[in-house]
Amino acid sequence: MLRFKVIMQFALRRLQKLSLLSFCLVSQFFCGHSFANETKNILFIVSKDTASYIQIVESIKTNINSTQEGVAFSLLQKDAQNRVQLAMEKSDLIVTLGSGAAEIAMGKKMGKKLIASLITESAFLALAEQYYGSKSEALNAGAGVVVIDQPLQRSIKLAAKVLPDLNHVGLMLGPSSKAKAPNFDKQLRDAGLTPKILSIATTDNPIHKIDPVMKVADVFIPVADSHLINVTTAKWILQLSYKYRVPVIGFSNNYVDAGALAAVYSSPDNVAEQTAEIIIEILEDDYQNNKIHSPKYCTLKFNKNVAWHLGMKIRDESYYTDGLCGL
């Protein structure tokens, strides 16, 4: 009887050890599974600490949180130099908003996945050349970009809908965009239109270049360029537009407020939505390769007072936006 009791106690102790071992193995399995799904750290670097930049960041975060779990966000302004360096080292993905923020991140060449958003294509190409030697080297190093330059086809389509008898199209290019003149010329001719293309340098007197084209154009379209070119030409473009009663299709909300008839542009919500979609692709390992992403979405705005001055009747906005952003 005593021997039977000893055997039973020994067997019980063995069973307890096996149960404990099984528990540890199961625990290790779950611990390993949890580690494989560790938190992804996304760092936002903004060029300016303003409401519009914060709005874009918050919208991106909302879109990501609606489909993703285990994502942590941090936000810094580009001028926080020491903090930016440390935050970039700890991040899994860096998202910059604005050319100033992109320059800070690209200049550090951290070897991290980087998405530069809210930036013109010309600004990105200049930074790629400066810090990586070429666009291809920057993309190969992990940089991708969401540019705000709306395709010219969208402005052409809008102009054709607003002006059914459209023929002569005045197009203004600057130093950053003049290389695209042959491509733009072809796009206009393919649409059955007559191009009147002018190129302005920083040393030119804008009115001397713009006036001859404006007076013979049915519509005038300035292509976004450097901040200096955009600012110095806008005043003359709008004054001559008023003088010759030629509608202007601009590239920003501010252009319309200042006196352009209309604009096709990337709104903060447009930028946020497309940027969030790309980030989600990266988080889900569904991002094929780094590239320059043209605007997927667009916003259209009219200045009804300018339309009245030009004697034009503007229809419901849906008439003009139908199929516009798909180009």
Where are these regions (language model features)?
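Bacterial N-terminal signal peptides that target proteins for export
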Residues: 4-20
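Bacterial N-terminal signal peptides
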Residues: 19-29
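Short hydrophobic alpha-helices and adjacent helix-cap/hinge residues
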Residues: 36-327
